[in-house]
């Protein structure tokens, strides 16, 4: 499996885990908004750190060197769609955005 697909799988898995944590906190925390904001901050920092890694940078180079770039792009698009579906379903603020409503991914 391509390094790029491994990375996309990792992002989707991480997002699913974050969504689960947010959902659990919503039901068990008295100060839900603070907890959710803290998890969003952590998730954002993790994504920024991930984008700065050599592994990610090398995966972009791998995409450019692939003979079947369209197939790789379609695989990545599929993973991003999964990621968006998870985010639209788990994040109430995101559910109300045009992105989630127009794509109907939140249902």
Curated annotation (Swiss-Prot):
Q: Which UniProt keywords apply?
A: Host membrane, Membrane, Transmembrane, Transmembrane helix
Location(s) in or outside the cell: Host membrane
Transmembrane region positions?
A: 5-25
Q: Which residues lie on this side of the membrane: Cytoplasmic?
A: 1-4
Residue spans, topological domain Extracellular: 26-107
Tell me the membrane topology, using the record's own terms. Single-pass membrane protein
Q: Which GO terms describe its cellular component?
A: host cell membrane; membrane
The protein in question is named Uncharacterized protein ORF107a
Query: What species was this sequence derived from?
Result: Acidianus filamentous virus 2 (isolate Italy/Pozzuoli) (AFV-2)
What taxonomic classification does the UniProt entry list for its organism?
Viruses, Adnaviria, Zilligvirae, Taleaviricota, Tokiviricetes
